């Protein structure tokens, strides 16, 4: 592994990142990730969800690569990967449909792993895990530190107390758990500090409010 690939990467100020990723988590925006030449997530055996409203993406993805998404309404589809775990739209290390890529790709941000402390030990995700370890958030003041601690507390709760929550509430994938922790972190805040008395029903309520009537675990 080259020194450049192991070098730390600036992830930005934590509160700034959290304010930007929030809308992406809720499906209301996209993530602005300084990927550089990294394409780890495109080579990590991810199934890519494409919603029926994503007409631009659907127009640029070969229909033969799409198949109905199990458990979702008609019109929701998935795109798979090749025998090496690579997205079929990845050509010579670059996304061939970048300007028209699906929402799943536009909202993916591997900094969620650095933010939450969630580790993806799936062997097919080693490239993503390696890249995620390089990110370093800037904590300029107490607000940054408290918010970061709240996000990590949410992630720890979803892992350590999953048995206290209804079955299937917590996603089975590391990406899903990390994203969910970001989405519900406010439940772990009170009076400018991290709570240590959060109850399961509060977490369930926060998850329900975040997901709405239908919100697929896209990764």
Where are the model-predicted features located?
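Short loop/turn segments that flank or connect secondary-structure elements
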Residues: 1-219
């Amino acid at each position: 592994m080259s020194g450049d690939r192991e070098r730390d990467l600036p992830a930005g100020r934590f509160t700034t990142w959290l304010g930007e990723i929030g809308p992406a988590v809720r499906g209301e925006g996209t993530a602005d990730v300084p990927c550089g030449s990294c394409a780890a997530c495109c080579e990590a055996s991810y199934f890519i969800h494409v919603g029926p409203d994503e007409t631009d993406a659907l127009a640029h993805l070969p229909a033969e690569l799409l198949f109905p998404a199990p458990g979702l309404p008609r019109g929701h589809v998935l795109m798979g990967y090749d025998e090496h775990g690579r997205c079929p739209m990845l050509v010579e290390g670059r996304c061939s449909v970048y300007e028209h890529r699906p929402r799943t790709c536009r909202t993916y941000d591997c900094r969620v792993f650095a933010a939450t402390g969630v580790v993806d030990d799936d062997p097919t995700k080693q490239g993503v895990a390696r890249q995620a370890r390089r990110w370093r958030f800037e904590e300029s003041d107490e607000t940054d530190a408290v918010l970061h601690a709240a996000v990590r507390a949410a992630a720890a709760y979803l892992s350590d107390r999953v048995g206290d929550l209804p079955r299937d509430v917590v996603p089975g994938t590391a990406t899903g758990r990390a994203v969910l922790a970001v989405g519900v972190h406010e439940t772990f805040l009170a009076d400018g500090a991290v709570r240590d008395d959060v109850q399961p029903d509060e977490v369930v309520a926060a998850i329900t409010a975040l997901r709405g009537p239908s919100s697929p675990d896209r990764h």
